[in-house]
Regions:
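Catalytic core of the metallo-beta-lactamase
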Residues: 113-169
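Metal-dependent catalytic neighborhoods of phosphoester/phosphodiester hydrolases
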Residues: 68-76, 100-103, 218-226
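Conserved beta-strand hairpin/beta-sheet module of binuclear metal-dependent hydrolase folds
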Residues: 1-46, 140-155, 172
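Active-site neighborhood of phospho(di)ester-bond hydrolases with catalytic His/Asp-centered motifs
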Residues: 32-36, 54-60, 64, 94, ...
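Active-site metal-binding motif and surrounding structural segment of the metallo-beta-lactamase
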Residues: 38-88
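Cap/insert and terminal regions of metallo-dependent hydrolase folds
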Residues: 159-242
Length: 245
């Protein structure tokens, strides 16, 4: 398996960058995880056409994770009308808020499927499961397992015990890292860099990638704060870079 970082900022992109979006691939399947601002253009530079996508998974329905879906649906729906494709891409997402979920569809661009914490998806020998995170709207972490290896994408969340359990001995943990500890407040529904390091250390992950970083931060400062708690392999999830799992 491999994961390509299409965007790593939140809740808005750096100049020339993109918000959350990740292309998960193995020998047979291509699955898009989240589709925030700037992701569609990046995705089209990595695949031949949207027909190549086997599925899309939206971790939650905040716009920095879904805004380009609202454009992608036109690309697919209009191309269907023109006879350029007859494919409707399976799209999995929580239905909260319902009005945003209802906006995802355009014509027959997607086969919409509601996600919940008991959902299990299989693509060949890839098994994908979900854990409920702690965020203002329903948000799911994505856990991908294949041939004894585990990849975990946290999506957005504040610190919670399930983070450690679901990430135990992951080959790769792609973790949101939206705050520096000095900026953390009681009502923040995101992880500080220090907390990310603690999760990675307690879960004994093989490699840690930092994403969903506030675009005004100095990336070295973020990385150095993580390293206070985690002495393992850690780096920024650099946009357009591909990481093996």
């Amino acid at each position: 398996m491999q994961i390509t970082i299409l965007g790593n900022s939140g809740p808005y992109p750096r100049a020339g960058g993109a918000c959350s979006g990740y292309l998960l691939e193995d020998e047979r399947f291509k699955i898009l995880l989240d589709c925030g601002n700037g992701v569609l253009s990046r995705l089209l530079g990595k695949i031949k056409s949207l027909n190549d996508l086997d599925a899309i998974i939206l971790s939650h329905l905040h716009f920095d994770h879904i805004s380009d879906i609202m454009v992608m649906k036109y690309a697919i729906g209009i191309n269907q009308e023109k006879g350029m494709t007859n494919k409707s891409i399976p799209l999995y997402a929580p239905n909260d808020p319902q009005d945003i979920y209802d906006m995802l569809q355009f014509k027959n661009a997607f086969k919409l499927n509601e996600l919940n914490s008991k959902s299990i998806l299989t693509f060949g020998d890839m098994k994908i499961s979900f854990e409920l995170m702690s965020h203002p709207i329903t948000t799911y972490a994505v856990i991908v397992e294949k041939k004894g290896k585990k990849f975990v994408y946290t999506s957005d969340t504040k610190y919670c015990d399930v983070l450690i359990e679901m990430s135990k001995e992951a080959e790769l943990l792609l973790c949101e890292c939206n705050l520096l500890e000095k900026d953390k407040t009681e009502d923040a529904y995101h992880l500080s860099a220090r907390e990310v390091g603690e999760v990675a250390a307690l879960a004994d992950v093989n490699k840690l990638l930092l994403t969903h970083i506030w675009p005004e931060y100095d990336l070295n400062e973020v990385l150095n704060e993580v390293k206070i708690m985690f002495s393992g392999d850690v780096e920024i999830a650099t946009e357009l870079e591909t990481f093996e799992i």
